[in-house]
Amino acid sequence: MSLFEGAGVALITPFTEDNQINYEKLEELIEFQIANKTDAIIAAGTTAESATLTPEERMQVIKFCIERTKKRTIVIAGTGTNNTASAVEFSKKSYEYGADMVMAVTPYYNKGNESGLIDYYTQIANSVKCPVIMYSVPSRTGVKLSLNVIKTLSEISNIQGIKEASGDISYVADIVNVAPKLDLYSGNDDMVTPMMALGAKGVISVTSNIIPKENHDMVMNFLNGNVNEAIKTQIKYIDFVRAMFIETNPAPIKEAMNIMGFNVGECRSPLGPLSEKNREHVKNIINKYGLKK
């Protein structure tokens, strides 16, 4: 049985004008996701600006998402960081709060070697009694998990999934080959159907902050054999997907949400507002697709 099938949202963190977490808005976003068929909510991940949340804020966001979701969909806690002890503590607390599973990005900046990466994920897995999803995004972390590391970790009973965002489809095929037991999820919104052709169960998506139902339907169409319909959706939204990564995530998606009236605030420094040129492009894309709150 899969961890989940479908499109999970890498949920943004909304902020007030004075840069504090806007919990009233966060609850609105959770309700919007549930009403629009999201298959999982990822709390306090990269798109949630976890790197600029304090440890207390991070755990508050995770706890809030679990409490407000009320088991209506899966909640996956983003617990990875570049300090193994902190990642273990985040994972333990998330599990205690009731997270369905935890997802840990590879340690960034300090670039652990193979033994260090194996130790990092092993400690996380040993700290919880729920499934663990590895998250590989080399463009942001500077770390690409070797196939040996992935194979070794896949043999730990509760390391059951990987969110893969390298953009390297041949590497994805290698992962499926060496670790067939892992549930695979696309971490790239522009590669959902190609990765599903190699066995992915779905996507953990940035664009689902705006189009959760469309992404859910795309994945379900593919899983149910309506592959051509899924491909049509992938192609239809490709310009939207590109626009959401015109600058560093989550700045474009938050800008788009603000244009649409979600009023989620700005990103925390060092992520600044979009350039005027890119803001205008995002606005034009929103209008092109007729996207509304």
From Swiss-Prot:
GO cellular component: cytosol
EC nos: 4.3.3.7
Family annotation (Pfam families): DHDPS (PF00701)
Residues given in the record as pyruvate binding sites: 47, 204
Site feature Part of a proton relay during catalysis, where: 46, 109
Domain of life assignment: Bacteria
InterPro entries: Aldolase_TIM (IPR013785), DapA (IPR005263), DapA-like (IPR002220), Schiff_base-form_aldolases_AS (IPR020625)
GO BP term, pick one: lysine biosynthetic process via diaminopimelate
Broadest EC class assigned to this enzyme: lyase
Pathway: Amino-acid biosynthesis; L-lysine biosynthesis via DAP pathway; (S)-tetrahydrodipicolinate from L-aspartate: step 3/4
CDD domains noted in UniProt: DHDPS (cd00950)
Keyword Lipid biosynthesis belongs to the record: no
Catalytic residues (positions): 135, 163
Entry GO MF terms: 4-hydroxy-tetrahydrodipicolinate synthase activity
Substrates-to-products reaction catalysed: L-aspartate 4-semialdehyde + pyruvate = (2S,4S)-4-hydroxy-2,3,4,5-tetrahydrodipicolinate + H2O + H(+)
SUPFAM superfamilies according to UniProt: Aldolase (SSF51569)
Keywords: Amino-acid biosynthesis, Cytoplasm, Diaminopimelate biosynthesis, Lyase, Lysine biosynthesis, Schiff base
Localization annotation: Cytoplasm
Family per similarity comment: Belongs to the DapA family.
Function text: Catalyzes the condensation of (S)-aspartate-beta-semialdehyde [(S)-ASA] and pyruvate to 4-hydroxy-tetrahydrodipicolinate (HTPA).
Subunit and interaction comment: Homotetramer; dimer of dimers.
HAMAP family: DapA (MF_00418)
Protein name (database record): 4-hydroxy-tetrahydrodipicolinate synthase
Species: Brachyspira hyodysenteriae (strain ATCC 49526 / WA1)
Lineage: Bacteria, Pseudomonadati, Spirochaetota, Spirochaetia, Brachyspirales
